[in-house]
Amino acid sequence: MKNSFLENLNQGVHGLKPYEPGLPLEHTQKKLGLDKMIKLASNENPLGPSPKALDLLQGKMNTFSSEFNRYPDGNAYELKEAISKKYNVNLNQITIGNGSNDLIEFVSRCFLGEGKKAIYSQHGFAIYPLAIKATGALPVKSKAKNWGHDLELMSDLIDDKTKVIFIASPNNPTGTAKTLSEIKDFLKNLPDDILVFLDQAYYEYIEGSEFDIPFSLIDDYPNLVISRSFSKAHGLAALRLGFCISNPELSDYLNRVRQPFNANSLALDLGKVALFDQEHISKSVKINSSGMHKVKKAFSNLNYNFIESWGNFISFDAKQDSDLAFQYFLEKGVILRSLKVYEMPQHLRVSIGTEEEMDFFLRVLEDYEKDLSKK
């Protein structure tokens, strides 16, 4: 029997392919029957959550459990106060998301629809075209330059139907980043009726002051939205929490399409503590920098081309079909990310893990290179 009601699906939903997350660690290890397996596929913080956030969780466990029947603070007031204090922004500039993906959805729902366009970059985050298409709008893919955003080309692609431009710095999965000067030049020459969503989920890992893009830039460019995430350096990926800063009028509209209780109580309470745990953030960045240096050195020694990264991951040319390479590492106990879906048919992405995890990955990489050279 034909489900005729499916004929009424919104046009943009037809043909959508769902986002595919990294393989789950325990299930995959059990399925393959391996004694040891590590996951370096989802750009998670190998140190885990902020210790101060965990201390709060332990101390308030009884309180939390007795309040599970209560809705969370729908306005996230205390978390917004913490963000306001740390970044010197006004409360009415802040929008809280269930992860930063939520914020991408807010912007798409507010500004996109049938007959409209949004521009994103080749090799850019897979959620951008999904969010655009779901509204019925047309995603316009701008060809990448040196694995990153070609801002000049993105400007050239603008027409009277363009409403939003998505930019990530650092960009996932390539790790490329844009300097403040490059972003300023781009905004300066952009029509002020086009919204720019600057995704900075990996902001804390950036090394180099030239890449520091302050929230105060919004004062000069009210069509700019800057998003951040608690999933990476803060180690709260499981709680799904992010935020964006925009001009107050825009923030008002973003909050109108936001679900009333989109961030749960645990996320709100732990987020405001993790935000100020600078010791944990610094340690996370230090471990990432050390692991990045080690893996880049190994890639160079084994003659693997890699893309310079400003995130907590690095992508490299596996010298063969990325799905085949992914399967090899998987069977050896390392979950990586194949980048074929990102139009990078020979590239794998590896998240920077603990020293022990990176040593394990590099041993498998050496075995991979030996086996590859036999073919």
Where are these regions (language model features)?
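Active-site pre-lysine segment of PLP-dependent enzymes
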Residues: 133, 151-160, 173-196, 200-233
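PLP-dependent aminotransferase class I/II
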Residues: 50, 223-307
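Conserved PLP-binding catalytic core of the aspartate aminotransferase-like
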Residues: 289, 299-332
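PLP-dependent aminotransferase-like
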Residues: 110-167
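PLP-dependent enzyme catalytic core of the Aspartate aminotransferase-like
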Residues: 181, 328-332, 336-337, 341-375
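Short acidic capping loops at alpha-helix termini that bridge into adjacent secondary structure
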Residues: 36, 90-94, 115-117, 161, ...
